């Protein structure tokens, strides 16, 4: 079994248990906000990731760190969940658990996450129109758009929704024409 499959098998039950607890106490949105905060902290600090992943750092030190930094910022149940993850020796997987929790929330709320890559920033009208189109295509209740700028596209856009890609960029069209004509590069 691949390492990513093993990690997924380990982390999924934690994310599911966190969601189940949040639903039981009707704090799904609060816990989601807490998880977003934790995920931002992890993604913005490689030192924090290294600290949490280091097996030589005692569990009590990791608990003390969270007690001093997050205990007053997050819901007590989210904090208890963090302590449980530390006690079980899975704190190095916290980022993956958090991402899986957010994926479960998206499924629960029938929200589709779409990454939109454009050459230039879109106007608010264009964003709203794109949001409505993606909603119709995916039958989602909500669409969460994440925008990235790539000036190499020249014009148009690329939309990534799960494993689906819609390439409506000028660069994509030029590359397809080049492939059709048998050219190596455009």
From Swiss-Prot:
Its main location: plastid. One of its GO terms (molecular function) is proton-transporting ATP synthase activity, rotational mechanism. Keywords: ATP synthesis, CF(1), Cyanelle, Hydrogen ion transport, Ion transport, Membrane, Plastid, Thylakoid, Transport. It comes from the Eukaryota. GO terms for cellular component: cyanelle thylakoid membrane; proton-transporting ATP synthase complex. InterPro entries: ATP_synth_OSCP/delta_N_sf, ATPase_OSCP/d_CS, ATPase_OSCP/dsu. It is found in: Plastid, Cyanelle thylakoid membrane. F-type ATPases have 2 components, F(1) - the catalytic core - and F(0) - the membrane proton channel. F(1) has five subunits: alpha(3), beta(3), gamma(1), delta(1), epsilon(1). CF(0) has four main subunits: a(1), b(1), b'(1) and c(10-14). The alpha and beta chains form an alternating ring which encloses part of the gamma chain. F(1) is attached to F(0) by a central stalk formed by the gamma and epsilon chains, while a peripheral stalk is formed by the delta, b and b' chains. Belongs to the ATPase delta chain family. NCBIfam families: ATP_synt_delta. F(1)F(0) ATP synthase produces ATP from ADP in the presence of a proton or sodium gradient. F-type ATPases consist of two structural domains, F(1) containing the extramembraneous catalytic core and F(0) containing the membrane proton channel, linked together by a central stalk and a peripheral stalk. During catalysis, ATP synthesis in the catalytic domain of F(1) is coupled via a rotary mechanism of the central stalk subunits to proton translocation. This is ATP synthase subunit delta, cyanelle. The gene is atpD.
